[in-house]
Amino acid sequence: MVQAKAGFKAGVQDYRLTYYTPDYTPKDTDLLACFRMTPQPGVPAEEAAAAVAAESSTGTWTTVWTDNLTDLDRYKGRCYDLEAVPNEDNQYFAFIAYPLDLFEEGSVTNVLTSLVGNVFGFKALRALRLEDIRFPVALIKTFQGPPHGITVERDKLNKYGRPLLGCTIKPKLGLSAKNYGRAVYECLRGGLDFTKDDENINSQPFMRWRDRFLFVQEAIEKAQAETNEMKGHYLNVTAGTCEEMMKRAEFAKEIGTPIIMHDFFTGGFTANTTLARWCRDNGILLHIHRAMHAVVDRQKNHGIHFRVLAKCLRLSGGDHLHSGTVVGKLEGERGITMGFVDLMREDYVEEDRSRGIFFTQDYASMPGTMPVASGGIHVWHMPALVEIFGDDSCLQFGGGTLGHPWGNAPGATANRVALEACVQARNEGRNLAREGNDVIREACRWSPELAAACELWKEIKFEFEAMDTL
């Protein structure tokens, strides 16, 4: 029988005696996390922050004698800094450093299980939100990242110098496979680069996945032949099991599709990483939808900020990721949105608190993920979208294409004309933020499709105060 070491003292002691270390200087190899923390009344901020560090690393609620069988100083998380949140009562930013050895190589699943596991139900906290993570380069290098990345995607598609243009097929549910393929063809023939399955299209009684894949691929090939442009459709391979997901991906490869899609949050990071690695091995692009993200990222004081999910998805693997629009129907303040957009596609991003970036992040040359602006956007938004997101983005219109009064193909043409006009105006030195509406009106003179779209949506706005603010 193993005996406890002499000197072991059973009982409960304050977390801060072990896990609050304000004199600690983080190492380059540490994983750093920033939590927005709201302690329960009467709980000191230092104790609450130390509790977060403990419960997300080596600690438990009482002293255990097996602590003596390891080196806690080597493995414990440490709260090294604590800041009051400006303009908020009883809220604090707790900065915690975690040793590299706490995490399995190449596993987003393991990182999140530690950082946002049981600690979020801790009674000493009224609320807790993971605001940001700094992944050390030593850990970054164990991840594959996006299957291909922005540069390789452009080379595959032979499309340069402008944002990519897409459309989500609507109605999202209820179409037969043949009618679905017809809508895909009309949109691609009208001028779009991509069309897309909506997130909840999988394999339902009204349209089984195999039928959809075949009719969609026929539409892609027909549109490519008629336009002499590379086209694609995001075939959603998300399924109830990983085995079924991979079966659908293999079939998509067999019929020649260039890109597939996964709902990463509902499907899970393990499934997503598996699919991303397969996509790189098989030369298939991977579009990622973020369905369910707002359940955990929309509340300001509890959950996980989307910038964390975006970083994790880039490591797990995805060539596209939905990122909000700033100007459409979905949540997203400009500074915050562009902060995590840069974290998706840039190789090195400096700390910038004004944009919600709490740590400098070096991705060590990992390929970037292209942001997808989608949700309640139409032709009048085009100048702002081009000005905000730049060329390395995908502008994804659903109702803003299929809602055109003349049909799907004219709707696609209207969007393509608006995009080309805005890119040309920008390249000529015009300021889209000031002159965007004039650019669109000028283009309407020679595009009746665009003129009809502008007339239809001239009064449509989504003006609600953003909740995602600093």
UniProtKB/Swiss-Prot annotation:
Which InterPro entries does the protein's record reference?
Answer: RuBisCO, RuBisCo_large_chain_AS, RuBisCO_lsu_C, RuBisCO_lsu_C_sf, RuBisCO_lsu_fd_N, RuBisCO_lsu_N_sf, RuBisCO_lsuI
Q: Which UniProt keywords apply?
A: Bacterial microcompartment, Calvin cycle, Carbon dioxide fixation, Carboxysome, Disulfide bond, Lyase, Magnesium, Metal-binding, Monooxygenase, Oxidoreductase, Photorespiration, Photosynthesis
Q: In chain numbering, where does the site feature Transition state stabilizer fall?
A: 329
Catalytic residues identified in the record: 170 (proton acceptor), 289 (proton acceptor)
- Binding of substrate: at which residues? 118, 168, 172, 290, 322, 374
Amino acids binding Mg(2+): 196, 198-199
UniProt-listed NCBIfam families? PRK04208.1
Q: How is this protein named in the record?
A: Ribulose bisphosphate carboxylase large chain
- Whose protein is this, by species? Synechocystis sp. (strain ATCC 27184 / PCC 6803 / Kazusa)
